């Protein structure tokens, strides 16, 4: 490809164009180029490939190679009619911009609240009105949010304190100490973590402060005679500023009380009384120097509902609803609902007016982004720099909104209404993501609910008659795992060599197109297969998939028997069909003239391809030869084309692809005996659901330490039925009776070898597992059938050599598994007496079952999919590269060049500790991280001895012979050899050297020496240069 000029679209955010990817047309074409192409298509309606290629060269200056343009045109030509139309071209450009959008490719697969809620506290005696978490503050001012306690308050003045794991710690009662007939009615509470105090605002016009150090709950101070009851409290503490307690009362009056953070005991009490009483007027007048109170007056029209302090702007926010008792004529008037007041600059205030007022809000000071919710159930988004009108509104709640918070840099809004229904919103797209209603079905409808968002654990806690919690987009613990690729087990993993992308399908009904070189999601198809059950739309698990012969379309099969054809680049469904209602599809194949699908219907169903290539008439059932469900199948495209199918009972049937006629039949329990090819005469009923998908579920924790063999009776062995889990054709091998071309894996861990020739049959078998209870579930090979890759139920990946001639030394350098060990591992011991095939590699790639394998020959990469929802990339030698969909990034992989040895390989976090020695050796590339105790003690001893020599070594001594005897120092011929001491880790060389004292050497006149050297005559052979040394200079 040659690049003549670099063009960028006007207003494009891309500063430079990637010259190595000519298929990204949206990065090359300008707006004028697109308009020119539009006019050209209006005139010609459609373009041939050569015409489009010439036009793109004229517009962009990009010279495509034949292979590059063929791939590009196949991506554009979705109709597959060898003509390019305008809608196809513009759709391809739009998809290119969509793939470049970083927010589009980072779309989360899970819903924000995907896990079930958990019950923290059961039914409470008194409903909870306030939940708050208090961190632990050290004496030096260090705040530790991972250690703290929970505090729950009730209106009946009962305060409960709980540990971080919600175990009860203590209970306090905020009753009045005066003899009053009326009981205390709490309006709001606040924890003062840095002072170890608890503040209570009650309906008795009082503010009570309690000491909560240790197990006590002691009343210390009472601020009484407050003009109006305080309804809202918000406490803020920081090491850089004074601690502040913001208060809002029933009339909309706001006040701020400041404390001195440098004093550990801000309250000085009277020695004659255990409780200090202070009137509110004395607090305002400054009679109590430990606290300073500032009254900002009535800034809001009604009861203050929520408060928040913003430290960067040194201001606070407050909101209130409109007065419901106001006259009807004044209700239409807009009152101030939200205020942003600076603490010191009283004239610096921002007012926001909302109809009916505001009950709650969420504010992001970094983006100046404010979201408000009120009794009308509508969410309004504001830019506080322009508070006149909201930026946007979100409607969806059927009741008043009482709580909300922001998440992920103000990208998501969580809002809860009075009916305890939580809704999650996408701020950028302004759409509803999820509606979560489990809280409303668990809590009492008549009891108001309070909420608290724990930013540390990303957890929403809701309290009423119970205390419940639900994780909200929980963070991935990178020290334990790299994340997940799907939300449920992965069933299909395919590599498309045309587009050089990876496609995965899972039981979550997701189809994801991956750019595995950069760990990016290119396309996400959600709810690919669905069905309506009891009026609800439910997802259907995807169990099989394949590409069309041109590698442009994707065919998927689901558990309900439906088949769908997808354009995986655009995510559009192009056709749909079904083999039988309720029959799981276990294998699909797309041939040039037909589509073959099979599953629990016991037969192969053929859908002929219509004239247009996208219409599929009614399916035709082949001859029924299986007595049970078909579990897997494989196709060979070497002439003559054949297909092999196997059932749950171990039956293997070979079919001719062209005619659909069976020509061989075997049983895995007795592979040497050929079974006559006869049609099934018994009527097959409706298929029943089996536990076939158990490989995708969490497996048992097998604890067998060594492989054991159970000897069964001969009669029982003959009656045993063996299930075949996977079939694989070796297509590069010739069709010959003595050449093995089909591999079948049994549930005993044995792989059988068959020849699909008419005169062929069972040729042999070999053991492919080394753990008791394990079995091979997935298999794949390279195009030349040199390597065989097997994935087992326990998560092990093995690489086998299928060639008889090989270079053993070269393979040992390539595979660390082949290095000699002092004690061979179980994988090597299991194949010690098994000559062929040769085991090249064995390591644990996943903790759970490996459901699919895919090998990329160009880069020599092996990709494994597991029931643990992950897709991992491995090198041919077994080194771990990364996990698709993980937030952990790795260096970009070249799509056409094998990965270099200097690549920064890692070890999966879940495999760093509990793995076998063989797996650890493979994951480390042959480097041994374990040292013997004797070797460690020897190195420590040498280190101590060497450090002593280096630190306290003897100084250099003068030579014994005086310098006057030999004025020119020692001659080289008389210097004795130094005896070095090599017992240390570092040899002290200077201790054994004899160094001449240069300070007493005779100083030579250099000018005189140069003159004498110039006068030397070397013309005679008798003259020697040594004569100079014999003269007296």
UniProtKB/Swiss-Prot annotation:
SUPFAM superfamilies: WD40 repeat-like. WD repeats lie at residues 54-96, 132-172, 181-220, 353-392, 396-435, 485-524, 537-578, 625-667, 719-764, 771-810, 845-884. Disulfide bonds: none annotated. PANTHER family: EF-HAND CALCIUM BINDING DOMAIN 8, WD40 REPEAT DOMAIN 95. It comes from the Eukaryota. InterPro entries: G-protein_beta_WD-40_rep (IPR020472), WD-EF-hand_domain (IPR051242), WD40/YVTN_repeat-like_dom_sf (IPR015943), WD40_repeat_CS (IPR019775), WD40_repeat_dom_sf (IPR036322), WD40_rpt (IPR001680). This is WD repeat-containing protein on Y chromosome. Keywords: Repeat, WD repeat. SMART domains: WD40 (SM00320).
């Amino acid at each position: 490809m040659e690049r003549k000029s670099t063009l960028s679209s006007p207003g494009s955010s891309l500063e430079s164009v990637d010259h190595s990817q000519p298929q990204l047309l949206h990065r090359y074409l300008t707006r004028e180029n697109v308009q020119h192409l539009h006019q050209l298509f209006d005139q010609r309606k459609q373009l041939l490939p050569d015409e489009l290629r010439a036009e793109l060269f004229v517009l962009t200056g990009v010279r495509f190679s034949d292979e590059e343009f063929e791939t590009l045109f196949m991506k554009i030509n979705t109709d597959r009619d060898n003509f390019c139309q305008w809608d196809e071209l513009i759709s391809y450009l739009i998809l290119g911009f969509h793939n470049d959008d970083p927010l589009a490719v980072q779309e989360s697969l899970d819903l924000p609240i995907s896990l079930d809620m958990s019950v923290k506290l059961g039914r409470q005696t008194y409903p909870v009105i306030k939940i708050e978490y208090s961190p632990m503050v050290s004496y030096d001012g260090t705040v530790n949010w991972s250690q703290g306690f929970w505090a729950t308050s009730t209106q009946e003045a009962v305060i409960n304190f709980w540990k971080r794991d919600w175990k009860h710690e203590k209970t306090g009662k905020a009753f009045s100490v005066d003899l009053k007939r009326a009981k205390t009615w709490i309006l709001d509470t606040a924890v003062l973590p840095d002072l170890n105090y608890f503040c209570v605002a009650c309906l008795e016009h009082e503010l009570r402060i309690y000491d909560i150090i240790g197990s006590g709950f002691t009343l210390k101070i009472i601020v009484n005679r407050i003009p109006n009851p305080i309804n809202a409290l918000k406490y803020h503490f920081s090491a850089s500023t004074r601690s502040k307690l913001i208060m809002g009362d029933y009339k909309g009056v706001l006040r701020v009380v400041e404390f001195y953070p440098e004093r550990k005991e801000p309250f000085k009490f009277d020695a004659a009384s255990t409780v200090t009483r202070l009137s509110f007027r004395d607090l305002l007048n400054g009679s109590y120097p430990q606290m300073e109170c500032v009254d900002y007056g009535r800034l809001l029209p009604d009861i203050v509902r929520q408060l928040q302090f913003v430290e960067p702007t040194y201001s606070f926010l407050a909101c209130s609803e409109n007065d419901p008792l106001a006259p009807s004529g004044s209700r239409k008037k807009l009152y101030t609902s939200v205020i942003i007041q600076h603490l010191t600059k009283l004239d610096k205030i921002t007012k926001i007016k909302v109809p009916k007022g505001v009950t709650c809000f969420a504010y992001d000071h970094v983006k100046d982004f404010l979201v408000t919710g009120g009794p009308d159930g509508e969410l309004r988004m504001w830019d506080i720099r322009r508070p006149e009108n909201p930026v946007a509104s979100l409607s969806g709640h059927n009741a008043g909104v009482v709580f909300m918070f922001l998440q992920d840099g103000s990208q998501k809004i969580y809002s809860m209404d009075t009916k305890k229904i939580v809704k999650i919103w996408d701020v950028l797209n302004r759409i509803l993501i999820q509606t979560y209603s489990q809280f409303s079905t668990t809590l009492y409808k008549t009891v108001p609910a309070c909420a608290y968002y724990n930013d540390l654990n990303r957890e929403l806690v809701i309290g009423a008659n119970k205390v419940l919690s639900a994780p909200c987009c929980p963070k991935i613990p990178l020290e334990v795992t790299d994340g997940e690729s799907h939300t449920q087990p992965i069933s299909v993993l395919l590599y498309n060599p045309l587009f050089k992308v990876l496609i995965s399908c899972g039981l979550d009904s997701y189809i994801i197109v991956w750019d595995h070189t950069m760990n990016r999601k290119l396309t996400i198809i959600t709810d690919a297969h669905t069905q309506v059950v009891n009026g609800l739309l439910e997802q259907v698990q995807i169990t099989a998939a394949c590409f069309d012969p041109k590698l442009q379309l994707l065919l998927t099969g689901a558990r309900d028997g439906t088949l769908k054809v997808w354009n995986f680049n655009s995510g559009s469904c192009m056709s749909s069909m079904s083999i039988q209602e309720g029959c799981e599809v276990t294998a699909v194949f797309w041939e040039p003239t037909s589509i073959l699908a099979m599953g629990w219907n016991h037969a192969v169903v053929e859908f002929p391809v219509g004239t247009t290539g996208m219409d599929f008439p009614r399916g035709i059932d082949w001859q029924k030869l299986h007595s049970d469900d078909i579990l897997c199948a494989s196709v060979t495209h070497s002439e003559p084309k054949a297909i092999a199918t196997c059932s749950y009972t171990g039956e293997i049937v070979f079919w001719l692809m062209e005619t659909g006629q069976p020509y061989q039949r075997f049983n895995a329990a007795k592979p040497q005996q050929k079974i006559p090819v006869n049609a099934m005469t018994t009527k097959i009923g409706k298929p029943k659901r089996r536990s076939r998908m158990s490989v995708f579920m969490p497996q048992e924790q097998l604890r067998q330490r060594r492989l054991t063999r159970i000897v069964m009776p001969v009669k029982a062995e003959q009656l045993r039925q063996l299930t075949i889990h996977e079939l694989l054709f070796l297509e590069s091998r010739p069709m010959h009776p003595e050449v093995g071309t089909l591999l079948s894996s049994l549930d005993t861990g044995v792989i059988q070898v068959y020849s699909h020739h008419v005169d062929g049959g069972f040729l042999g078998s070999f053991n492919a597992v080394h753990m008791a209870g394990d079995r091979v579930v997935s298999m794949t090979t390279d195009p030349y059938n040199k390597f065989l890759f097997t994935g087992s139920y326990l998560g092990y990946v093995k690489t086998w050599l299928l060639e008889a001639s090989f270079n053993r030394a070269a393979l040992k350098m390539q595979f660390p598994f082949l290095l000699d060990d002092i004690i061979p591992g179980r994988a090597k011991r299991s194949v010690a007496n098994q000559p062929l095939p040769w085991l090249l590699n064995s390591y644990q790639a996943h903790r759970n079952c490996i459901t699919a394998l895919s090998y990329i020959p160009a880069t020599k990469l092996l990709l494994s999919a597991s029931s643990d929802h992950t897709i991992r990339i491995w090198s041919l030698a077994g080194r771990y590269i990364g996990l698709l969909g993980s937030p952990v990034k790795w260096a970009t992989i070249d799509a056409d060049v094998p990965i270099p040895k200097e690549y920064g390989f890692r070890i999966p976090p879940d495999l760093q500790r509990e793995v076998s020695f063989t797996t650890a050796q493979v994951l480390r590339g042959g480097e041994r991280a374990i040292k013997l105790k004797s070797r460690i003690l020897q190195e420590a001893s040498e280190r101590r001895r060497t450090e002593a020599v280096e630190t306290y070594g003897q100084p250099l001594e003068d030579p014994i012979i005086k310098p006057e005897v030999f004025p020119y120092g020692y001659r080289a011929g008389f210097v004795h050899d130094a005896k070095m001491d090599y017992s240390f880790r570092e040899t002290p060389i200077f201790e054994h050297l004899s160094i001449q004292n240069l300070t007493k050497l005779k100083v030579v006149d250099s000018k005189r020496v140069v003159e004498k050297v110039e006068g030397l005559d070397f013309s005679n052979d008798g003259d020697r240069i040594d004569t100079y040394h014999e003269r007296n200079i």
